[in-house]
Amino acid sequence: MKIDFIDSIEKITKEDWEAVLSSKYPFLKYEFLKALEVTNCVSPEQGWTPLHLIASENKTIMAIMPLYIKTDSQGEFIFDWSWADAYYRNGLNYYPKLVSSIPFTPASGPRILITDETRSREVIQEISKALKQITEESDFSSVHILLASRDEI
């Protein structure tokens, strides 16, 4: 399985993204996430840099995970400023961190979109390895999966 990280939703076709989206959850729709990007609502200047995860096998997309590099905690609806302060007091950087979330949306929902549920355990294991690797290589403090749906917890 190959894991790639893309810095814009436009690096994948709408058809490929929507083929993986099995629910009608509106905040994961290609058009919604693209609109956030093209209007610069999510951008490095806003503290939300897209870095979406794409898992594929034989050039077929198996899974997608919306991801963002966060340089602050604005727009997450997870109030972790005390965590950031604790990191700072101990000489550590809390930012940048890697976040799977829907920007500015305090609604729970799917965060890992998988095409073949019979392989979900395997896919999640590969995604976990890739997230650990990119966190270490890119010096992110941590990975956060925010407001995931109940069945993903």
Question: Regions from the language model: what does each represent?
Answer:
Residues 1-153:
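N-acyltransferase acceptor-side catalytic subdomain
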